[in-house]
Amino acid sequence: MEGISITKLLVIAVLIVLLFGTNKLRTLGSDLGAALKGFKKAMNDETPAAKKSDGAEAAPRVENKE
């Protein structure tokens, strides 16, 4: 099996540009970039439930005795 060649990828890219137009693709890329930026920001922000309170200590570690 050959896979997808460069010429096939170029033909697919040209068809996509012809179907959607450059303006629609530009707005789609912009919207996708904004969505990814928002997702990354949400993943990096700590939620209040994930923060440890000042008075709380970690539970002692329990090991199995056999």
Curated annotation (Swiss-Prot):
<feature type="region of interest" description="Disordered">
    <location>
        <begin position="46"/>
        <end position="66"/>
    </location>
</feature>
<keyword id="KW-0653">Protein transport</keyword>
<keyword id="KW-1133">Transmembrane helix</keyword>
<dbReference type="InterPro" id="IPR003369">
    <property type="entry name" value="TatA/B/E"/>
</dbReference>
<dbReference type="InterPro" id="IPR024905">
    <property type="entry name" value="TatE"/>
</dbReference>
<dbReference type="GO" id="GO:0008320">
    <property type="term" value="F:protein transmembrane transporter activity"/>
</dbReference>
<comment type="similarity">
    <text>Belongs to the TatA/E family. TatE subfamily.</text>
</comment>
<dbReference type="GO" id="GO:0033281">
    <property type="term" value="C:TAT protein transport complex"/>
</dbReference>
<keyword id="KW-0997">Cell inner membrane</keyword>
<keyword id="KW-0472">Membrane</keyword>
<feature type="transmembrane region" description="Helical">
    <location>
        <begin position="1"/>
        <end position="21"/>
    </location>
</feature>
<keyword id="KW-1003">Cell membrane</keyword>
<keyword id="KW-0811">Translocation</keyword>
<keyword id="KW-0812">Transmembrane</keyword>
<comment type="function">
    <text>Part of the twin-arginine translocation (Tat) system that transports large folded proteins containing a characteristic twin-arginine motif in their signal peptide across membranes. TatE shares overlapping functions with TatA.</text>
</comment>
<dbReference type="InterPro" id="IPR006312">
    <property type="entry name" value="TatA/E"/>
</dbReference>
<keyword id="KW-0813">Transport</keyword>
<protein>
    <recommendedName>
        <fullName>Probable Sec-independent protein translocase protein TatE</fullName>
    </recommendedName>
</protein>
<dbReference type="GO" id="GO:0043953">
    <property type="term" value="P:protein transport by the Tat complex"/>
</dbReference>
<dbReference type="Pfam" id="PF02416">
    <property type="entry name" value="TatA_B_E"/>
</dbReference>
